[in-house]
Each structure stands twice: as structure tokens, then as C-alpha cells.
């Protein structure tokens, strides 16, 4: 049985990973999360009673607390997901992204290195530090049919993606300089259950159900590759346990869609699954409203995920159609979860860009 320390484990992707490990493997999990607005213990409720689950409310920028967590829990692997991750908020307030994504990653690397150096030789060789990153570090695929590969040069275009690119470089440097056994994954856009409603898909679902406008940036022609979060969780565990030290693996869903098409798909599913519309709404798609585009908005992201398929045998199980149906059904069936999120600090806006 491995013990896996997961930073950001109360977040969207992190909680999906925790639920997967507890439900589908025999490994134990220690979640480290400072519970910012996007961290939600309700997302961990399905597994919180497991004897293989532990939770530490700790900021990854707190070196002393991290040292305590490593000493007390003695993990065999670190999976680092703690990050500020919303592009709009990074434009409005980049400082938190620099602090968490760069300084926090540095602090975690140093805590992990000190712990790793004190391990026995067999435990040192088995230890892994898996850093979870984004395809946004590669920049934009404007006017091409190319795909991001593991060797695509970095060209981040937002404060968020620049901070994640910085953290990727730190992780690689800690392997080359100190020998810390690291791996990196870069993923495409995730969606699915327990997604915080500042992001496109849950925001559109909940706005439509409330009869609110569905804001689409620019002309809605921006293209993203969509990855169902439970497919991503399987991929992350696969890389952490079977990936090769020093390697980078791109994880994508093979589902490129224009943003406008995504919103229209949501509207079509709601017509079928939630036919009792809010007062005054004839068709959900009538709520679509085009708004001023995001500054520096990348036109296209698309991932070539052939390496992880070829070398580790991972493939996504959900198509965009099956994953979107599951996602809409989950939000319709779990009103209590998203109502409690909305009752907190978040009030159904695209956070950031306050002018």
C-alpha cells in the first residue's frame, strides 16, 4: 500500500483523484489543502470516512507545516495539484498566482527534498514527486492544425499560464540539480462533477437553470480540448505509479470543441433533461449572450496524448457527448452541493476582470 500526499486535494481535479484512489485502489491518501474559495470538503465527503484518508489544512507556502506533514505521514509519493487556476482572476490579480503557483511549488519542492534526502535508499528510489500542470503553458495554436506535444516550446500568454510554466521549470530543475525523482503532466480543459462554478461548463449549466444570461467571450470560436475529470484522475494515478522519472506526459480527451458549441450542447441537454424552464425562457439557447473578449485570449488549445497511450496504456473512456451528459445529470441531481457553493463567497460570476 502506497501513501500518497495530494496537495489541492479538496479542489476539483484533486478531489476526483482522491475519490478514485480511495474507491478504486488500496492506497492511502493524505490531502493537503488550505481551503481557498475553490476548495470544498463536500467534494471529499464520499470518501472522508475511509481509514485510508487523512486531511491536513495546510498552506503549501508554509514550510514548517509541510515539514510536519511529511514527518508525520511519511508519504511514498507527492501529487502536486494545489494551484490558483482561473485565467480571468490571474488577469485581475496576479499576485496570488505568483505566490501559490511559484513560491508554493518551490516551498513544496524543498520540503519534499529534505524529506526524500533522509529516506533509506530503497525508499528514496521508490519515491515520486508528480507535478500536475496545464496545456496553457504552451500558449496558442492560432491558425494551425497542430497539436501540443511534450516537446512543444513554452509560450504562456496569461499570468496564470506563466506562473504554471514557472512551476514546471522549477520541478525539472529540482530533478536535474538535486536528483529529486519528478514527473510532470500537462492536461487539457477538465470538466465533470464537483466543478466550481466560475468555470465555463458549470457556470453555463447553473446560469441556464436560473434563467440568467450565458456569457460567451468574443464570437465563441475559441477551441479547447475537453477532458472528463474522472478520466484525468485515472491518468494521473497511472503516471504517478507507472510513469518514468523525468518524463512529461500530455493528457487530453481527444475532444476539440468551440466554446460556442460547448454552450449550445449544454442548452440541448437541458432542453431534454430539464424541460421545465425558468419563467420567461422559451429556449435555453436564447440566453446566450456574446460579451467582450478576454485580453490575450488564446484561440486554440489541442493536446496530442499519444505518448501516455503508447507508453502507459491510458486512454479516455468518456466521449465529449457521454461526459457532458453525465455532467449535466450530476448538477441536476446535486443541487445541495452547488447551492452551498453559491451561498458562500462565490455569486455566479466569471471571477476577475473587474476593470
UniProtKB/Swiss-Prot annotation:
Pfam families, alphabetized: GDP_Man_Dehyd
Cofactor (UniProt): NAD(+)
E.C. numbers: 4.2.1.46
InterPro entries attached to this UniProt entry: dTDP_Gluc_deHydtase, NAD(P)-bd_dom, NAD(P)-bd_dom_sf
GO function terms (MF aspect): dTDP-glucose 4,6-dehydratase activity
Keyword Lyase: yes
Positions contributing to NAD(+) binding: 12-13, 33-36, 59-60, 81-85, 100, 160-164, 190
GO biological process, one term: polysaccharide biosynthetic process
Keyword NAD carried by entry: yes
Cofactor binding, note field: Binds 1 NAD(+) per subunit.
SUPFAM superfamilies documented for this protein: NAD(P)-binding Rossmann-fold domains (SSF51735)
Domain of life: Bacteria
Catalytic activity: dTDP-alpha-D-glucose = dTDP-4-dehydro-6-deoxy-alpha-D-glucose + H2O
Binding site for substrate: 85, 134, 189, 199-200, 215-217, 224, 259, 293-297
Recorded metabolic or biological pathway in which this protein acts: Nucleotide-sugar biosynthesis; dTDP-4-acetamido-4,6-dideoxygalactose biosynthesis; Bacterial outer membrane biogenesis; enterobacterial common antigen biosynthesis
Catalytic residues (positions): 135 (proton donor), 136 (proton acceptor), 160 (proton acceptor)
Protein family membership: Belongs to the NAD(P)-dependent epimerase/dehydratase family. dTDP-glucose dehydratase subfamily.
Subunit structure, as described in the record: Homodimer.
Function (record text): Catalyzes the dehydration of dTDP-D-glucose to form dTDP-6-deoxy-D-xylo-4-hexulose via a three-step process involving oxidation, dehydration and reduction.
Identification of the protein by name: dTDP-glucose 4,6-dehydratase 2
Gene: rffG
Amino acid at each position: 500500500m502506497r501513501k500518497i500526499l495530494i496537495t489541492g486535494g479538496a479542489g476539483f481535479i484533486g478531489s476526483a483523484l482522491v475519490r478514485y484512489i480511495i474507491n478504486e485502489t488500496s492506497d492511502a491518501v493524505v490531502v493537503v489543502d488550505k481551503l481557498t474559495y475553490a476548495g470544498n470538503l463536500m467534494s471529499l465527503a464520499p470518501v472522508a470516512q475511509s481509514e485510508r484518508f487523512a486531511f491536513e489544512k495546510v498552506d503549501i507556502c508554509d514550510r514548517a507545516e509541510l515539514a510536519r506533514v511529511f514527518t508525520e505521514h511519511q508519504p511514498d509519493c507527492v501529487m502536486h495539484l494545489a494551484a490558483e487556476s482561473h485565467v480571468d482572476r490571474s488577469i485581475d490579480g496576479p499576485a496570488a498566482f505568483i505566490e501559490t503557483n511559484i513560491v508554493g511549488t518551490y516551498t513544496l519542492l524543498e520540503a519534499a527534498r529534505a524529506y526524500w534526502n533522509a529516506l533509506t535508499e530503497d525508499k528514496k528510489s521508490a519515491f515520486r514527486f508528480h507535478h500536475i500542470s496545464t496545456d496553457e503553458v504552451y500558449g496558442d495554436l492560432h491558425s494551425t492544425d497542430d497539436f501540443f506535444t511534450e516537446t512543444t516550446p513554452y509560450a504562456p500568454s496569461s499570468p496564470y499560464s506563466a506562473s504554471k510554466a514557472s512551476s514546471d521549470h522549477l520541478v525539472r530543475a529540482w530533478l536535474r540539480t538535486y536528483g529529486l525523482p519528478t514527473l510532470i503532466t500537462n492536461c487539457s480543459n477538465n470538466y465533470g462533477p464537483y466543478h466550481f462554478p466560475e468555470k465555463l461548463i458549470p457556470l453555463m449549466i447553473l446560469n441556464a437553470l436560473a434563467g440568467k444570461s450565458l456569457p460567451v467571450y468574443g464570437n465563441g470560436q475559441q477551441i479547447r480540448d475537453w477532458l472528463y475529470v474522472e478520466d484525468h484522475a485515472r491518468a494521473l494515478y497511472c503516471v504517478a505509479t507507472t510513469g518514468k522519472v523525468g518524463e512529461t506526459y500530455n493528457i487530453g480527451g481527444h475532444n476539440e470543441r468551440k466554446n460556442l458549441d460547448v454552450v449550445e450542447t449544454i442548452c440541448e441537454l437541458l432542453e431534454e433533461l430539464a424541460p421545465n424552464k425558468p419563467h420567461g425562457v422559451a429556449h435555453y439557447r436564447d440566453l446566450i449572450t456574446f460579451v467582450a473578449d478576454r485580453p490575450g485570449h488564446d484561440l486554440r488549445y489541442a493536446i496530442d496524448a499519444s505518448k501516455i497511450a503508447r507508453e502507459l496504456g491510458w486512454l479516455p473512456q468518456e466521449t465529449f457527448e457521454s461526459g457532458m451528459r453525465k455532467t449535466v445529470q450530476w448538477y441536476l441531481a446535486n443541487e445541495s452541493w452547488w447551492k452551498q457553493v453559491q451561498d458562500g463567497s462565490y455569486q455566479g460570476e466569471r471571477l476577475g476582470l473587474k476593470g
